[in-house]
Amino acid sequence: MMRDKEQTLGNLIDHQGVSFISSVDSDGFPNTKAMMSPRKREGIKTFYFSTNTSSMRVGQYRANPKACIYFCDKRFFRGVMLKGTVEVLEDAASKAAIWQEGDTTYYPLGVTDPDYCVLMFTAQTGRYYTNFSSEDFTV
């Protein structure tokens, strides 16, 4: 059992360069995509990712906000899955909060690019795997 869930999982999450994010398609099937690490996180409850407004994933989250994110430490073969919902944010404050230098590579019109938005993932439950065992938890 984890002694300090937020510290243990936060440390795992912060050391991964890639995260996996899943949505549900119109046929009810999961769709998983590798993404860069979240731009910002608030504990293990809320995570912010940048993406293109025109992406397939944004359309899926608007139709069905159920989502899952996964972080894996392949060196020690441990990982955490968080289940929750995604909200697509397009307001100026949310976009500015996670904007980074170099983002014009993806969003050439800058922070106000209409094809730039923020995915805010809010976790409800999770499952942590380490040392050949799993632990379910509530966030």
Predicted regions and their residues:
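Short Pro/Gly-enriched beta-strand edge/turn motifs at strand-loop
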Residues: R3, Q16-I21, Q100-D103
